[in-house]
Structure formats: C-alpha cells, structure tokens
Amino acid sequence: MNLIHVTNGDSAARSLTEALLLAGRDDQVIALRDDLAVGPIRDVDESPVARATFWRHVWNSAVDFEAELKAQQALFGRLARGDAQVVVWHGQSAADQLTLRRVAYHLRNVPQRLNEAKLAFDDLSVAAPDAHPEEASRPDRATAVGMFSPHQLVAKLPSAAPISVLRISRLALEWQEAKHSNAENRRLRDNMLVSGTWTDVDEAMLDIATSEWCPARRIAGEAMTQQFDFLLSDSVAFWRCRELVAAGRLKIRGTPSEIVDAELRR
C-alpha cells in the first residue's frame, strides 16, 4: 500500500524518516514547515502574503517565506489529488493539532484516504536507546512529534488508523473556525483550540527579566519552558523580546537585530 506520512516540522520529519528506515520501510515523509499556532491564518489556504509578512517580522529576515508557503499550498493540492493513503502524525500541542485539522480540511472530500498516528505524553516514557528523557518532564504534558526519538516512533507505527468521516468533518470545521478567528495565537486546552494574545507571554518574559542585565537567551529559554498551552519556539520568544524592547518595556544592551547575543533588563 502506498503511504505518505505527514508531520509538522523538519525535526519531526527526520525522526520519522529514520523510524521508517529502522522498520525496513521506504514510505514518503512530508514535513509541513509552518507553526500554525502563531500569527495570522485567515487566508493561509488562499494566499501566503500575510503569513510570509509575519514570519519575516519574527525572523527579522529577508528570506523568501512567500515561496516556501506557496510550495506548502501546492503540496496540499497534490495530497488531495493523489491516491495514496495519508497518515498524519500529531502530538498534543496546538501546532500539531492545527496541522491535523488543516490536512483534514484539504482531504475532507476523500476521507477514506486519511489516517492518523497519535502521540501522547506517556509515549515519551517508552524505553528507547535514543529517547529524550528531559521531554517527559514537561509540567504541561504537551507533546510534538519532534520530541520523540526514532525508536519511540517505530513503536507507534502499528497505531496508525483511519479517521472516521464524522471526525474528519469536525476537524475540517474546526480548522475553518480557527482561520476565521484569526487570533494572534492559538492554544490547545482540553483538546480544544482557543484564541489567545501575546499578553501572557510578554508578562512572563517581563517577570523573568530583572533590573540587572541578563542574556536574552536566558530570558527566552526560561519562557520556552513555561505553560502557555502552545509550544513557544525560540524564534517567537526572541521576537517577543524585540517587541518588548521596541515598546520600551525592556532595555537592551546590544542591538534588536542581534537579539540572540544581546542582554536585557527591565
């Protein structure tokens, strides 16, 4: 049977590819490279412009995000037009759950082809020579496919199962609702997606900062360990540091464009 595995992020795709090789399989793995938990998504399925603008701002970079996002849009079209069985791998995190819902939306007219492999927090405790034990200590019990080692993913390969037509319809509807809300960010609470703002993230960073100079890396790193009901990435954490500097809420020793190497204080 022709199988295509879909997951969120390059790290997850690399681990999954290695897992398939360990299992003696050569199935195709596709990485979707967009953290859908953050930034505008209202027209993400029609135009890459708003998302590209957002990511250029976050990364403070002239990278051609528009081309990358256009390629992702074309990928969804090819998935929908193909005839392979599609397996979406997802953990319990906002970005992974949004990825699942987006794929369900695009494959809603061919529901017989859509499958899933679920990864729970307890799966992080599965003994494996390449396991990452630090991931199993998160107080929020959040998971993303990229947290799991190849050997742990091998153990989950048999769990891939079809998604019911009714659930696919519900997932597709939830994706449309998330797009329509177009919040600053999206959180996963009790397996439900809810809209959020940057207020609590910014306040957490201000609480971490003190009146003494502190490396921005430390502030961002500590913020990334806190519970926001979505996984805060390093790029987004440094972006929020720059935004707080621009708003005059944090002082900087260094330059905002080189925030990774700067020091910050209140």
Regions found by a protein language model. Give the residues of each.
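Short acidic, hydrophobic short linear motifs in intrinsically disordered regions
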Residues: 211-226, 233
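A short alpha->loop->secondary-structure connector
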Residues: 25-26, 102-115
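Long, hydrophobic/aromatic-enriched structural stretches that serve as scaffold segments
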Residues: 58-102
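Short amphipathic alpha-helical interaction segments
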Residues: 230-246
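A short, conserved structural fragment
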Residues: 245-255
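A conserved mid-domain beta-alpha-beta active-site/ligand-binding segment of alpha/beta enzyme cores
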Residues: 131-214
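A structured, charge-rich N-terminal accessory region that forms the first stable segment of a protein
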Residues: 1-67
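Short, cationic-aromatic polyanion-contact patches
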Residues: 255-266
